Amino acid sequence: MARLSRERYAQLYGPTTGDRIRLADTNLLVEVTEDRCGGPGLAGDEAVFGGGKVLRESMGQGRASRADGAPDTVITGAVIIDYWGIIKADIGIRDGRIVGIGKAGNPDIMTGVHRDLVVGPSTEIISGNRRIVTAGTVDCHVHLICPQIIVEALAAGTTTIIGGGTGPAEGTKATTVTPGEWHLARMLESLDGWPVNFALLGKGNTVNPDALWEQLRGGASGFKLHEDWGSTPAAIDTCLAVADVAGVQVALHSDTLNETGFVEDTIGAIAGRSIHAYHTEGAGGGHAPDIITVAAQPNVLPSSTNPTRPHTVNTLDEHLDMLMVCHHLNPRIPEDLAFAESRIRPSTIAAEDVLHDMGAISMIGSDSQAMGRVGEVVLRTWQTAHVMKARRGALEGDPSGSQAADNNRVRRYIAKYTICPAIAHGMDHLIGSVEVGKLADLVLWEPAFFGVRPHVVLKGGAIAWAAMGDANASIPTPQPVLPRPMFGAAAATAAATSVHFVAPQSIDARLADRLAVNRGLAPVADVRAVGKTDLPLNDALPSIEVDPDTFTVRIDGQVWQPQPAAELPMTQRYFLF
């Protein structure tokens, strides 16, 4: 019996078990560990759509109606890259959720068809063959300064935004906060028509618990403590006390100037309670020079923002101007200039690289328009992974040499912007991974453009954004091919396929009856018991020390010397600027 060669099989159906794929132009390779579509042994039985192909009536398409359980959409033959593994499978979507990961087709004539992936007349097909599928990005640090950032986020594969703001107000440009019931209501209403899940953070800087509770009833999903509003030990303690009762998360930007205490005082005020530490390295703010040491605390859930990812020869130069603008500083005032300069330290930025590679810093967000770029979360993450592989070699468990594959490193890094922030903020029951039962917030990538620009972005099972050519052309592919909104981005559809994450107290207060919103309000899960060990593949707790005079960083006793990268992948090969 004739058999297909592996090369020919890959040309027809995409990679299979044992094949390796390079991610964009990085040094990262992933190996497919399982093929649930069949593989060369069942060649010809794969679910493939097209003229003369498998998914036709009484062939790969069966008789099952939607009422019989047929999925609304099947993504065929995709390589799934997620924190739990790297496999090839067909993915079934129904009612906006993932219902099956396995083999699709017609069980009347095909073997091994998953019971929830029976293709019928009601089923649409998206080809994932020779493409990669990931979960949509969960950006855990977004300043809602202007609505245009949502366009940029979607075009980069972001499907969930955690943050706050009211527009280009000085408070929003600095602090990621939507303060008070009125602002929360107006922002929840204004965001209703975008095909993105939103979770707004209320202002946590107060010693008045009543002011915190009213924000939870008004639609906040949690709180943000920011030094520009005064992150005092008393405010930290009060906010966490309310959060412990409410079950919500608190994000912290601590006191850079050490006016109300040092990092040890903040750790004392936190008192072992779960907290999300924003820009843990410190360039984005926090106790100078040693806020990075909180990454060694088991109750602290540490994240980075993307402008310091990875450390390059240009990182320091661009940060000073960013700081002056974002924090409303005056370069003619010496104290303001000193404040800005105290936050930019090559040694801690370099240490941030290796702490990510070890899994000691667990998440990456954007800090959009406030010292970060909303469209570069994914790109900066993989640039960091590339730089670390070049400097540190293969991670433990990853083969090197001619059989090199970076599955462990890739799974660690993808978790930083998908499942880890979802767990930290109580959303992982709905989002954060490619798993059955979750919203079909999925991103398809061409391997050559992985992490650079998505091929298709699905929001709740509907195609919301895609790389699309000239609309007046005779076929969809003629240039210019640009990321463009699709039908799933229409306001009514977006509301039907997206949610606002809110505190459970707002559900109890019947917030939906008081808002002009069409989307569902989804209560966040209780996160008060979430610690670093709950963040998959990113739970390392090394010893971290910072010399207060030289800013030298020791990780498990070893000095990590800055070696800023002079060249990166995913840059001028893809972008003009």
From Swiss-Prot:
One of its GO terms (biological process) is urea catabolic process. GO terms for molecular function: nickel cation binding; urease activity. InterPro entries: Amidohydro-rel, Metal-dep_hydrolase_composite, Metal_Hydrolase, Urease_alpha_N_dom, Urease_alpha_subunit, Urease_AS, Urease_asu, Urease_asu_c. The keyword Metal-binding applies. Optimum pH is 7.2. Ni(2+) 1 binds at residues 141, 143, 224, 367. Disulfide bonds: none annotated. Its EC number is 3.5.1.5. Ni(2+) 2 binds at residues 224, 253, 279. The active site is at 327 (proton donor). Residues 136-577 form the Urease domain. The modification N6-carboxylysine is found at residue 224. One of its GO terms (cellular component) is cytoplasm. Carboxylation allows a single lysine to coordinate two nickel ions. Keywords: Cytoplasm, Hydrolase, Metal-binding, Nickel. Its cofactor is Ni cation. Binds 2 nickel ions per subunit. It catalyses: urea + 2 H2O + H(+) = hydrogencarbonate + 2 NH4(+). Pathway: Nitrogen metabolism; urea degradation; CO(2) and NH(3) from urea (urease route): step 1/1. SUPFAM superfamilies: Composite domain of metallo-dependent hydrolases, Metallo-dependent hydrolases. NCBIfam families: PRK13206.1 (NF009685), PRK13207.1 (NF009686), urease_alph (TIGR01792). Heterotrimer of UreA (gamma), UreB (beta) and UreC (alpha) subunits. Three heterotrimers associate to form the active enzyme. This is Urease subunit alpha.
